Regions:
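Conserved HGGG/HGGXW glycine-rich cap/lid loop of the alpha/beta-hydrolase fold
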Residues: 41-85
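Catalytic active-site module of serine/aspartate enzymes centered on a nucleophile-bearing elbow/loop
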Residues: 273-322
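Alpha-helical macromolecular-interaction surfaces
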Residues: 64, 71, 97-100, 104, ...
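A short, glycine- and basic residue-enriched loop/turn
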Residues: 58-59, 124, 283-284
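N-terminal amphipathic/basic-hydrophobic helices that include classical n-h-c signal peptides
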Residues: 1-2, 321
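Flexible "cap/lid" subdomain of the alpha/beta-hydrolase fold that forms the substrate-access gate
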Residues: 2-29, 35-40, 48, 76, ...
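Generic recognition of short, well-ordered alpha-helical segments
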Residues: 60, 64, 263, 290-294
Length: 322
């Protein structure tokens, strides 16, 4: 199956602004998989690194990280189903289905194994990709993400932090709020980033612009609805605990993350072969935008260690890197 390469400014058949925001050195194309048509932003050469954005963003969330990582790696930033310039069908928004999209993308790009950096929703997908296809993920840097081993007992005390999800996970209400009340989305970004100096209002407006489209507002709602109504309780009751996490994983979280307290991240090392947690002082929920240099440096340090470990074992890191 071949990738379909289109011009950066071509309008997505399912919507999306006609013009993608510009980042120096970034190439854009649309890739047709067996599941849907995905927009992918790419830069650099070397070992492939898959950057998975959070909710309710798209590839542009990585705008300051991409140039830094592209010095050492081939950086691949897809828009997830329903976000940015990727198609936004009515169905397919469960975590497992979003992971299916990523596997299909890796297949089309002929990538046998990748590094993954996932933020928030993207971090959750990175965990589930690692659990399902450990041979395809060499290492995972999870930013501001809830791992699949969370327990109700440990997370219940911080349930109040999720007050905002009621407005976006409720069917019909969520899409209406996201589409017609941009002030709510702006509020989430302000709460998520405690440092005014690193807030980029123009970037927030890029994300809001796509949410004004009915299909994408519906998609953003359904991601939240599927997780809240179908996946959260089974996860907290231990659905994934019998499955050991074999992929080396580093979790990076801000100490001032309004949505996810560091207190709920530790204590799950027994479920994994190599799982560590690091905290970023005074940082919030949007690490790729608040601390892009730190994210890139942490990723490079982590991935370099894994490459050295692989080289020492004299086993090829990947069979297909383009």
């Amino acid at each position: 199956m071949n990738a379909i390469v289109l011009e950066q400014h071509t309008r997505n058949r399912r919507g999306g602004p006609a013009r993608a925001p510009h980042v120096e050195g970034v190439r854009h194309r649309f890739v047709r998989t067996a599941r849907l048509r995905m927009h992918v932003a790419e830069a650099g050469r070397g070992e492939p690194v898959l950057l998975l954005h959070g909710w309710p963003q798209h590839w542009y969330a990585w705008r300051d990280v991409i140039p830094l990582l592209a010095r050492h790696y081939r950086v691949i930033c897809p828009d997830l189903r329903g976000f940015g310039w990727t198609e936004a069908p009515r169905t397919g928004y469960r975590t497992g289905e979003l992971v299916d999209d990523l596997i299909a993308l890796l297949d089309v790009l002929a990538l046998e194994r990748v590094f993954v950096v996932g933020h928030e929703l993207g971090g959750r997908l990175g965990f589930h990709l690692s659990l399902r296809e450990p041979a395809r993920v060499h290492g995972h840097l999870a930013l501001n993400a809830l791992h699949p081993y969370g327990s109700a007992r440990r997370l219940a005390p911080q349930a109040w932090r999720q007050w905002w999800t009621v407005f976006v996970e409720t069917p019909l209400l969520g899409r209406t709020v996201l589409r017609r009340l941009p002030a709510f989305t702006r509020l989430l970004f302000r709460l998520g980033n405690p440092n005014p100096d690193t807030r980029a209002a123009s970037a927030v407006e890029q994300f809001i612009a796509t949410l004004r489209e009915p299909d994408r507002a519906r998609a953003a709602e359904r991601v939240q609805t599927q997780f809240a109504y179908r996946e959260l309780v089974p996860t907290l009751l231990g659905k994934y605990r019998p499955t050991r996490l074999k992929v080396p994983t580093l979790m990076l979280n801000g100490t001032k993350d309004f949505a996810l307290s560091p207190a709920g991240l530790g204590g799950y090392e027994p479920y994994a072969d190599d799982l560590r947690v690091e905290l970023v002082t005074d940082a919030g929920h949007f690490l790729p935008e608040e601390r892009p240099r730190l994210v890139a440096e942490t990723a490079h340090r982590f991935f370099s260690r894994l490459i050295e470990r692989q080289s020492a074992s004299q086993v090829p890191l990947t069979e297909a890197t383009r």
